Design a protein with these regions (language model features):
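Glycine-rich Rossmann-fold phosphate-binding loop(s) that bind the pyrophosphate
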Residues: 14-16
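Conserved N-terminal glycine-rich FAD pyrophosphate-binding loop of Rossmann-like flavoproteins
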Residues: 40-60
Length: 242
């Protein structure tokens, strides 16, 4: 049983950024794995997110150098808090400019996910990410774990693995089964509107700018370099009420 289990793949529930990075990391250390994703087609959805230097370090270790990450975002240079009168309250450098060995990146979440998906398929094979398959539960056994999987047509299958990793998001079915007494998700009271629009980047050209009050604020930052033809970048914006 031990020999059989040592050859079984690690099963990953969820093909988001976390699940795909786990798959690449396991492959890098020689551990076979399979990713199961509920949607029938992964698309570049979402808006801007930030990768702090320690996260970029892990991507560098996986072979995503600055040149590759530059295809999905830009290196952040500054954070600035600005008063409603337009004067600076506080500002500081970010990434390498702040003394880190790695940059901080502002990226489009969907473009990063597509880059990770492409890389997983190139390194692990086209069947490494199985779409249209939602992990709805699991059964522990002496040799590892059996994942219970629901297909898009309503049929089910069972897949054996040595380990099951729950990367299936906020409403994780695996977490719900593992911790049935867990209380429901609690809303913290904040409301956020998020989006992207074309615009001219301000200050350093790669700055986070926050303006507003304790309860109402807007944050703006570019997630692409300016288009040479228009001078416009993709600007991520967040309007928040707390």
């Amino acid at each position: 049983m031990a020999d059989k289990n040592s050859q079984a793949p690690v099963l990953i529930a969820g093909g988001g950024i976390g699940g795909l990075v786990v798959a690449l990391t396991l492959h890098q250390v020689g551990v076979p794995c399979i990713v199961f994703e509920a949607v029938a087609e992964l698309q570049p959805l979402g808006v801007g997110i930030n990768l702090q230097p320690n996260a970029v370090r892990e991507l560098h270790e996986l072979g995503f150098d600055d040149a590759l990450l530059d295809t999905v975002g830009i290196q952040a240079r500054e954070w600035a808090l600005v008063g409603r009168n337009g004067n600076d309250v506080y500002s500081e450098p970010r990434g390498r400019l702040a003394g880190y060995r790695w940059p901080q990146y502002s990226v489009h979440r969907g473009l990063l996910q597509m880059l990770l998906l492409q890389t997983v398929r190139e390194r692990l094979g086209p069947d490494a990410v199985r779409l249209g398959r939602r992990v709805i539960g699991y059964r522990q056994n002496d040799g590892g774990v059996t994942a219970l999987i629901e297909r898009r047509d309503g049929s089910t299958e069972q897949v054996d693995g040595r380990l099951l990793i729950a990367a299936d998001g906020l409403h994780s079915a695996i977490r719900a089964q593992m911790h049935p007494q867990q209380p429901p998700i609690q809303w913290g009271g904040a409301i956020m509107w998020r989006g992207t629009t074309p615009g001219v980047p301000i200050r350093s050209g790669a700055s986070f700018v926050g303006v507003g009050s304790l309860r109402h604020r807007v944050v703006l930052y570019p997630i692409s370099p300016p288009d040479p033809a228009t001078g416009l970048a993709t600007i991520n914006w967040i309007a928040e009420i707390t």
